[in-house]
Each structure stands twice: as structure tokens, then as C-alpha cells.
């Protein structure tokens, strides 16, 4: 091996390492300001700090080396700790060897804290390397056919391996799951043979170790048989870990590429997922090999599954690369998993594994091109980063490499200064250094001996103890004395206890030495504060000089000896006066306009006026705004003796008026004024001259004559009334005796005996340049009786103004292909994803639509396949406006129009196109010049829109006519009223003509991008817009080029744009199949807007050539046209904007030619309309924009103005302000899992002020006074979307303090704090604990989990669509249910006789089920039984902040609470049971309702398309005999801002009542107050001393001799105005109310599908400002995924939002806030669950899909029984929300409380809808 100094490469490496060492910057302040007492402390302050040991040196000894030399310290006396980097082993890379190599192999480096060194690292991967392939296969029963296929494809796999490498080995292992409950059926017969012809269950077995003998491999594989287990997830993680660590048993070779193929179709178990708790397996995996002689895993019964971080670390350590071959059923789980492995592959395995060979080949080539380099075993004090100047990184951090070449990488090694506030040199030795293994994916790597320099200064080891130089009172070391206690001074000659020494330091009249600002040392003051205090007695404070605007010395000077020393050009006591008079120069270049003098940078005018500006010039804009109005009253009283100053007040006017015959013209005077005299309605006029400030001797000229209107018109009123009565009489006679008038009058509701349909308007006038679309929605009305259904056929004809146009169009070639537009209404609801092209839902539906429609239109001769299929919604279409409209285009011959129309109408009448369901009564067929269609009026619908195409073409006339005609009513009894609608489209003068430069371009594929110029000829300078799209010819999209479409917008003055089309390389297959054919495609312009017209050519052809055959003619050329003339001034040149901070932008430019008087700057937020721009005037060519938003993009431009007016604006410039630290995060929320485990979540800061990059969570113990105990632990959450953390192993019954702060590019923001003790929180029902999809922190453990995400409980569900579930065929016969509560959770007490996925999860209020399927514990009978429940404690989420965080009115805490759900379960789980469904619910009567949609497949009375909602309530709310029922009504009446009257009705009871109990407390926690009322006749109570604007929960219950009854609960808030300084004190006499007027109305949820719902709400009654829109937040109620936000614009009475992409059976929390001009208002909150159980273990129960809501609070209770009951919600005495009758017999009811809408769908299929009167709380 060559020595490290002999190689030129090593010299280059050392030179690069020396150059890369970070140089000291301007950090002298840091070294100087550090309060260090020794050399060692100084050296550790910063990497650039040095220490002077010169005894004669008198300055500060700790400084940078350069500063010390400059201050006079000798070079040999300066002590500096130098870092070092030395290569200890370096063997040159030999590319002829067929193995992976690195260089260098050994390195030793020592770094100072904060220092970074870099070096070059080389890695070589050969073209062909040895490969070890180990196949690990799932052997559960569902993989039986996969095993059979693997046995048959031996030759193919061997062939592929030989193609990959000549040196390979192959092995095989199998796994199922742990042989324990509940994973495996433990019955003896099932342990012997779980399936026919199968092996006993096992965990993992190494069947065939890695071998070169392929024949032996296949012979052993033939004898393998399948096995089985119970649950769907498998135990593959155990198998992967054993395969990695058992290197000798598996047979991994040292210098080969290790590939592990993991084949399964199921999800996986992982550490602490809860399954092992049931079997008592609690120990963590020890990460060791545990295989016996037969290769079987032996510790499956004693150790848990490994975690994801463990597998990632161990596979990387042993150079093993995983290849996940999984089926579609489990693809989503492994798609998340494989991203955590630096180098891995994921492929979709077919159901029978027939494609495993192809998948393996593809994965091998993908893996070979990626290389990951990681630093293993790195100590905490060192950070390693690997970069490359030539190689690209992937999203997982690996590099794209080329095999056979040496890759060069830059390794950056940095020593950190501190960790969590502790200096690195104070950490343990193992954290300061160690052996770092820099390891590539396929080789051993580089060993680095790295450490942080924490040595003690040598001079401190050589100190003179009790030195004579220190008067024997101290030690001399490092050039100075370190005095003993009680002595000070440079030579320790001053006694700190001697009073006489302080006398020279006492100022006259003071008793403190050095004025209390310093220390007296040997008769001399040494001032504190590092320069803050000065003077002989430290009497001057340099922070107490005069300030201006808060700045010391106006930031224009420095404070010295108590006075400001100003910078040049400034003067004054606080440096606030400029010496220059530049700010006093007027627009003419003079000083103060000659009417004043300049002092301290300001003009002092000789004569002050309201209309003079800062330079004593006349402000004409101010004159125009107020002058006329100021003079009006005086002119009116002096000239005419009228007005408000008539009489004596007129004598006070400061001027006189003069009546003249004629006034001067407006342009000759300052202002021409005109007003109306209120006394006689006449108009008088007068002029104002001069400077606009008439003085005592001034005269105002007034016109002598007034302009008066003609005589009075009051006599016309009786005449008009008479004429109107006569007209009404004539209309009545016409209707009676004239038949022709009946049709017209029939359109009026008052005159119609039947019902009619007709268009609302008869004429529309449109301007083409203002049109935003090529269609028009024309309303059609139905009058009279709205019962029944009517359909109307219509047609529209284009260009009716041209005689014979239709005949000419028909005479063209009948075989020519023309596009026909088709629109149909599908039988499914529309979602937002459907309207977004490219989403999976949209693509799936598009494929389904095109397949079915193509099948139908095959009957049309010459028809092509459908294209341009899109989906949308159409409003105003009756009751089906939420359904999906599909628009598509069909190419067919011109002669096929009639056949196409008849075929479409026939299929629409049938309600289907092949297998595609469509809604009858709606279609549109659009031809070249006409269109036909049909619309439908459903029952009760009065208005629908008819969407007609407008046939916008470039060749249209300047004024063209279209005619819309209602043809007939094929279905229904309506007669046609207004049948015709005329549409006139006026084409304005075009603002520009847009076209291509050339009709054809030739480009080379080697250019990768075709750049096609588009030009505009400006006719009228304004905006122009056109659409563009590519079309295939001989070139095909996605094969030769990437298709594009979009819109081009030309701003004023723009004449040139460029289209870019990405070109694709020609594949060999294409060149062989398609030969040498010239490939071309077209780019087409269309749909001009904003007055644009298409010129010629509007279509261009792009010819693709190869690299050596193209004569490229596509020239990128910027065309520009001179701007139109604007006066004598041009546009300012070279505008430049630069951010000057987070809220400032400096904008400057070069002046244009000419003499501008000033500049006008226009700026606005990018994306806003220019009409919302702000304007600034400037006299100089620069301006500073202030009061901006942080991290916001602004656009700006500037123009000059002069005497001729404004010139043209400059080009647009954009600039982004800097980031500012974010505000504190939103409120902290705690989901208490147990007394030692909590889930912490928080909201994003209200003001992010930039891009949030991370959050820091700190938590630590506090005492009873909330003071910290010990250090706080910090957790960095570097994914800003993940605002959730699971903290485990907290101490029992100990309060913790939690803080969360956010970071953006500007730094860390303030903290949000909360203190909570988990033990004091209420217990909640729990299921098996499943680790959510969030970071997990062990409060007592290390940091193993901090950088990895775990998986949620969805991995435990088997695929719903799987036809072969991997479970046993025995489902058991019953179960045992035991409630599991809080910290009493002990899963070892629980046993199941069913698989976990078949066990229903019941809430605490639902009782438990026995083996027979009936409800136990208080159940009486089958149909009318009741279940006894308990009253839960207040939810813990109201204590989310750990302090009394009172809720404002309308917040989530004031209106919403969580309640238990009503659950319906089947009576048995066997596949052969009856269809009996038993509904259960809690007996606790609450003021909340749950919403559930239920569908039974066996009933047949309701179609599946109906989304109905069922409100399930207690069937019998009565309890035991003699116990009072719940008080039936709870009514609140506000008596004042702090007092409330609570009333209720006497409950039903079989015994005599003894009294009542009223309890109340703050909704978000606090002291519980209780009032006992012994008088049973008293049903009201007055509560005093409530807090204003705070929500209270009240509970009322009655008592009899048998005990207390159930309670009635209600929540109320008294709103009132409070004192600004004391928010708990209401203002005397202020109004008070019980409403929440600034929150949105109640949230109403409607299920659309199992994964989407529709949310609607009403606008706030009294919003704070004008409503701009709403912000809707959707998040999982229990956490697990980042929150989603939606913006809904507009101010509608009722707003709606469709939310797709939800999960079934998962509770979601929705929050709605109104966004107003004053900001965001309070939230309205609701919790909802879409419940769905389709197939799975309950195939006989059909489909159960609906909504479960923890809904809004309201005074409402209902009982559903077989008879009609009345439900009356009350808000206060005498005001009811209305009465609802709920019919329980065969009806499904959707009910929303408070302000509510009730819809009832009966079993017979008829639908009735009514809207109750809506009330708000008052």
C-alpha cells in the first residue's frame, strides 16, 4: 500500500481539505463579548477564537488571531487550537477488479467545536458484480397459486440471473406469522394442518441457504407446501430481521450485492401494534440471530416484531437491498414502507406471481443505478453530509450513478457547538468522538477516527502556584494572575474587603462606588456593561441619550458621555435635524415655494392654509375635494339668503360675494362649483380663484341667475293612478273575452289554471370581448301547478341573420368528419376530484364512460372513438344539480347527425348507455351550426337553466344572431309559453390579432424542447388571450412528445410569447416498427378572449427530425413593438426592486428622456387584480414601499408624469419580502391514551410569515407551582405538515409542561405553552392501542424513533376487495366484550373466540353482546329493550391548554361537545344467520343527535343511489320504576350580562318529586357549582355572577324517593360588551345577548359516497365586516394525518363544499370560519363519521353506509317509537323553533338540530321536502 504522502492524489486531497476549512469571519464581537475567565473557556467560545498569553498585553485577551495581532500581542504568545485531517489508509481504486471499492479507506480528523472540514471520497461500482439473491415468500394459504408458479418458472429465473451476472447465488425462505393468539388458530387440529394438504404454522424458516447450484435449489423447492394463519397482516418483519442478521446461516458473501425479494399479498405486523399484547409478548426484539439447526426461528413467542427503524438500520448495516413484490391489495402499505429504505424497489405482483421474474429484472436494473452513502455509528457531536457536483440525488437521499465509472463525492464533516443548550465539550466522551463508518450501499466503506477538540490550554497546565508576580496571593498562568478569593487587581494587590480602597471611586454626593455601575479596583473604576457606562465614576449611561421615534440618537449617531455624537450631515440634540435642505425643495426647484423658510428639514410657511402641502405649494387635489363644500353655506346665505347660515350667522363669513352675469370657464379658475338650493330646488353656481383660501378682503363671483326646474308635477300623480286602474281593467277584459291573450297571461301565476313552461327572457345581447365562455345558461320557468315531471326539447340555430346559411352548410360533403359535442347527466354525484383531470377517480370514470359510449355509438357508421371527455356540475338544474355532467366529443360524418340524435335520445329515455347509468330527461347534441337537447323539470322545481352553445368562430359576422327554440314537451302536461329566445353577439374591434409566425417548423429531438413563437399585432393596446393545444398527426403524444394545452395571456404592450413542447427520445422499438416515416404534430390556437382575434396561420405543424437530419428553422426571436405615444415622456427604464426587510421593498428606476415632474408608482400583491393596486407619488426616481406583508410577492411598475399628463408605465417587476419569524402555534390539544401516554397536536401559526420548515416540541416535569424540574426534552419535527406527536413512558401522576414553537426561514417564533397532568384527565373507552401515523417519542428512552414514521391501524385491515383473504375458514361462534378504560387497560384479561377484525367495537354506552347475539346487561326483549348507561365526565379536550383558556362566543368550546354513538350490530357473525338488526343506544338523554345512513340489501324498498340519513334515538327513555325522567325542556333567559334564568319542565315520574339539582361550570373546565332546590314546584332558578362572553354547561335532574333521575344538559353563552382593560367586567348599560352572531350557521352533513360527503352552512347573522369567503379545515378527530384546508369564496346565504378522499369509519373534525374584511371570525365545529361495512365478515347484512355525527349543541330531545311524537326545541320563554313529527314506521329521517332542515324519504319511494322557518338564538 502506498503511503499517504507519496501519492499526488493524496496531496490534492489534503489541499482540498485545507481549502475547505471554514475561515473565521467577523466574529470578534463573539470572542470579545464572551465572559470567559480562562484560556480554555475562550478557545471553546468559537472556532476562530484565540488567546494571548503575553504578560505585557493590556487589552482583552480572548479575541480572533487577527485582532490580537492588531492590538499588539506577539505572534508567539497567541495560543490557537488547530484542527487536523490525516489520511491513514489509501489504496488506489483498481477498475479492472470486479468488486466495489472506495478510496480512501482510513481517515483521522480532529475539529474544533463549530468547525467544518471537507474531503474527497471516491466510490467505484463495477459493471458486473457478484449477486446474492434471497427470495422470502409469504406461505399463508392465499399464496398457494403463487408458490405453484414459482416452482414452474425455475429456468426463467436462472436465465435472468445469468443475464444479470455470471457470479450469483440463490436462496429461499418462507414465513407466515407468530404461532400464538390471535395470529394463529391454536386448536390442536389447526396447529397440525390449518388447511388441507398444508404444513403446520410457523414464523420463519430458512429453507434453502444461498447456493450456486440452481438445480439443487429447484429440487428442494418442489417439496414445499403452503401453511396458514388467522389474521390478515403477516409476520414478515420477523423474517426480514432474521434474514439480515443470520449472515452465516443464510450464506451472504462479503463482496457481493445482497438482494432480498419480499413477496406477499398482505399487510404486516410491526412493533407495538397491539397484536402481541394479547399473547403476553411484551419484550422488544434483541436484533440477534435465533435460528435452530433446521433454519426455523425460535424466539417468536418471547420477542415482539421489530420496528421499521430497526429494519432500516440493520439492512443498511449488512448491505441488504429489499425488493418488495406485493399485490394490488397491499400495495399502498408497502408504498409508504419502501420509502424509508435508502435503496429499495417496489413492484406490483400479479395475483398468481406469474410476473415475479420480470419484476425482479426491472428492480435489479433500477437498484444498480442508485447508490446510498450513509454515516453509521456517528457520535452526537459530529455531523456528516455527502454531496456530489456531478451526480443527482433522489428523494430518498441516494445518488444516480453510472456503473463502471469512479464516482467522486464531497464529504463534509462538522463538529457542532452545542446540543440542546449544552456545549459539546461538556458531553460524555463517547458523544465527542468515535469511529464513523462512511458506508456506500454495496461495499464496506471508509473508517474515520473523528473527534472534537476539547483539550485544555497547555499554559493552564504550566501555572505558577502562589507566584511572586501575583504578590503570592494568586496563581500566574497564561500571561496573567488568577487571584485568590478576597483579592483582585492585575497583580492581586487589591483587597476586596477593604473599605478604604473605595474612597477614590466615590463621586461627590453619592454613597455607591462608581455610581453603582462599576467596580472599584485599587482606587479606579472599572465600569460594567462592556462599554455601556463611561466616565471617571461610570456616571454616563450610553443608553440614555435622547431618542427620536424610539431610535437612540435617531440611528444617525452614537451616544458618548451622555450626549449624541451625530454623523456627518446631521445635527440636533438627538441627531434629528438634517443639515441638507433637500426635503424642502419644491416641484420648481426652489426652497419652500418662496413662501416660507426651511428649518431642520421642514418648511415653515409664512401663511398656513388647509390647501398647502409640505413645501408650501398649493395642493390642488385637496382643493378639489373640499373647497366648494367649505364655501357653499356662505355663498348661499349672502347671495340668496337661504341655507344653514341664513340670518346673523352669515355675518361670520370671511369673504364677500359678487353677483355677475356670466362666470368664467372651469379651466380658467381654481374650481367651478355648483349646488342645489334646498328651498326652491334651483341650482346656483360660483367660481373660486387664487390659492383657494379666500381671506377677509376676497370676493367670490356668483352667477346671478339660478337654473330652476319647470313647474310642479304633483298633479300627475292622480292621473297616473287612474291610468293604472284603467290598464288593469283592460287586461281583465282581454283575459275574459280574448283567446289570444290567454297564452300570454297564462305565464302569470295569478292567471294560470294549469301550468306552462317557457323561457324567462326573449333576447340576450352579448359582447364577444367580455364573454368568459362559449356557452350561455338561459333560464326556463315553469308556472302554475308544479306537481309532476315535465321534459322540454329545445334547439338552437347559428347565424340566422344570414339567409340560406343552413342550406349552404348542408350542401357540403356529407362524408366529411365533423366533431359532435355530447353532454349527458350521469347517475352519480359529482365530487371535486372528478372535476380535476389527472386524478385517479377522474381517470377511472373517464375510462368507464368512453368504453360504454363507444360501445353504443358503434352503430353510427364512420364514428370514431370519444375524446376530450370532461366532467362538471351545472347549477340551477333542479334536484339533480349535484349529479355529474359529462361533456365529450365524437368525430362522425356530417350525414350521421340525425341518427346520432335519435340514438342519444333513445338511450337517455332508457336511462343507460350499455352498462353506464344516466339520468333521464337531459342531453345535448351539438353539431357544426346547431344543437339540440332536452331539460327536465322535476316535481316542485320552478326554474332550470338551458345551457346552449354559442358557436364562437373567428369568421363570425360583427353582429351575429342565434335563435333558441323550445320545440315540445314529450313528457308531462305542461304547455309551451315563451318559446323563442334571440341571442345577439356583437364582435367588438379586436384588441389584437394573434397567430403563429410560420405555418411549419422543423426541430431536432436532440433539442429536447420545441420552442414555438406566438405573435400578436396590437390594434388596441389591452389584454388578449388565446387557448392552445397540441394534436397528433404522424407523431404521437407521450411517445414522441408530451402533449400540452393551456392559455396564453398577452398583457398590454406584449407582442411575443413562446410555447414550449417537450420532445421525447425515439425508442428502438418505435424506429423498427414505424420505419423512417416523418413524424409531425400540430399546435392549434383557439378560443380568443378579451377582444382578441385569430390570425393566419392559427395552426402550425412541427416536424420532428433526428440529430443529424434537421435543418432547424425554429428561431427564438423576441418581437417587440414600440409603445404608443403618451405625451412627451417615455417609460422609466431599468426598474429594479429589492427587499429591504420583511415589510419593506426598495424600488428604483432610471428617469425617462424629458423633464418629468414626478413619478407615480403602482404596486399590488401578486395574484390580485391590478385594480386593487396602491399608488405612491415620488419626486425622485426611487421609493421605499412600507407596511407590506412578510414573505409576500408584490408586483410593481412606475410611470412619469409632467405638464402633458402621465407617460407609459414601465415593465412589470416582482419582488418578495423577506421572511419574519412566525407567530405562536395554535392551541395545543391532548388526546390522552393512558396516564403515561398522550398524543399532542397543535395548529399551524395564525401568521406563518414564511414557509414553516419545522416545529420544536419541548416537555418536562414541573412542580406544584408550575416551575420546571430538571431539563426539558426537545423533539424536532422537521416535517411541517405533521403537527402531531405521540409521547410515551411519561411519569405517572406528574404534571408536565409542554411548549411548541414553529420555525421558518427567519428563525424560531414564540412558544405556545400548556401544562397538563394526564392522571387528572377523564378515562375514555379504548380499543386495542394502534400506533398512529405520527412520530413517536419515548419520554424515558433514547432517540431511536424520532426520525421515523410508524403506521396507523389501517394496516390491520385485510383488503376489502380481496377474493382470497389470508385467514382461516373457521370464524368462531361468538365473542366476549369487556370495556377497556384508561390506565386500567390490561389486555391480558381479555380473550377472544373470534379473529380481531370480526370483533365489534362497542362504546361504553352500548352494553355488550353475548354469544347469541342479543344485548346483555339490562336488555329486555328483542325489539324494545333498553340499555342502562352512565353519564360521562366532561371531555378532556376542554382542558387542552392546561389552564383556564376561556372560549369566545362561537368557538368550538361554546357550541360543540362529543357524545357516544348509537351503534347497530348484527345478531350473529356466522355466514348462515338471519338478517335481524338490533339497534341500541344510551339511556342518557343528551341535547345532541347522531346522523347515520343505513341501507339493507335484502329490503329492496330503497335504491342504493339514495343517500338517506337515519336518526336513531332511544326507543324507551324511561328508567326504573319511580325514578324521575329527564326534565323535558331546558330554557335560558338572559337577565343581564352576568345573570341568567334557567327554566325547565317537570319530568314524568310515578312517585312524588322531592326536588331538583342544578349544576353548572365553565365549558372548558373549572369549579363545579351546585344548587339544590327542595321545592318540587319550583322549576326555575336565577344564576348570578357569571362571566361574560364565556360558555357554561348546565345540568338539571330531579329526585324522588327512588333516587336521582337522568340529567338534562345544555350549553349557553351570554355575549356582552366588556371593558377593554378588564375583559371580565361588562360595560354598564351595554346590550347583552345569548347568540353567536359572528359564527357560521350550523354544519349540515350529507353522505355522497363511502369516501366523500357534502358540508353546508348558513352565513353568520352579524359578521364582523363584509364576508369575503370561508376557511374550512378538515382533520381526523383522533389525529393521524395532516389537516386539509379549503377556501370557499363568496357571500351566499347558504354555502356548500364537497369533501372527497375521506376514510370510512374514521371520525373527522370540521371547522368553518368566515373570512371578512376585518380578519377571521370564530369557528363553527362539528365531528362526523362515515360508517360503512360492506362485505367482509358480514356479507349477509348488505351495505351499511352513512354518517355518524357528534353534532352541534341545542336544546333538543326526541324519542322515536311506533307512534307519532312531537319534538319542540326551545331557546327562551315563548320562542320555539317549530314542531317536527318523526314517523318511525318504515321511514328514514335526516335530522339536524338547532337551525334545522328535515327531509323524509318513505319506503314507497316518494320524496317530500320541506323547509322549516329558521330561527337563531336571541
From Swiss-Prot:
Region spans: Palmitoylated on several cysteines: 734-751
Residues modified as Phosphothreonine: 1483, 1526
Residues covered by the Fibronectin type-III domain: 1131-1220, 1224-1323, 1526-1621, 1639-1735
Motif (Cell attachment site): 473-475, 1005-1007
Stretches in topological domain Extracellular: 29-712
Domain of life: Eukaryota
GO terms under biological process: autophagy; cell adhesion; cell motility; cell-matrix adhesion; filopodium assembly; hemidesmosome assembly; integrin-mediated signaling pathway; mesodermal cell differentiation
Transmembrane parts of this sequence: 713-733
UniProt region (Disordered), positions on chain: 1115-1137, 1402-1433
UniProt feature, compositional bias: Gly residues: 1415-1426
Membrane topology: Single-pass type I membrane protein; Lipid-anchor
Annotated region described as Involved in NRG1- and IGF1-binding, given as residue ranges: 195-200
Residue intervals of the PSI domain: 30-74
Disulphides: 31-49, 39-457, 42-62, 52-73, 246-289, 459-478, 470-481, 483-492, 494-522, 505-520, 514-525, 527-538, 545-559, 553-564, 566-575, 577-600, 584-598, 592-603, 605-616, 628-673, 634-653, 637-650, 682-708
Molecular function GO terms recorded: G protein-coupled receptor binding; insulin-like growth factor I binding; metal ion binding; neuregulin binding
Subunit structure: Heterodimer of an alpha and a beta subunit. Beta-4 associates with alpha-6. Interacts (via cytoplasmic region) with COL17A1 (via cytoplasmic region). Interacts (via cytoplasmic region) with DST isoform 3 (via N-terminus). Interacts (via cytoplasmic domain) with DST (via N-terminus). Interacts with RAC1. ITGA6:ITGB4 is found in a ternary complex with NRG1 and ERBB3. ITGA6:ITGB4 is found in a ternary complex with IGF1 and IGF1R. ITGA6:ITGB4 interacts with IGF2. Interacts with TMEM268; this interaction prevents ITGB4 degradation.
Protein name, UniProt field: Integrin beta-4
Gene: Itgb4
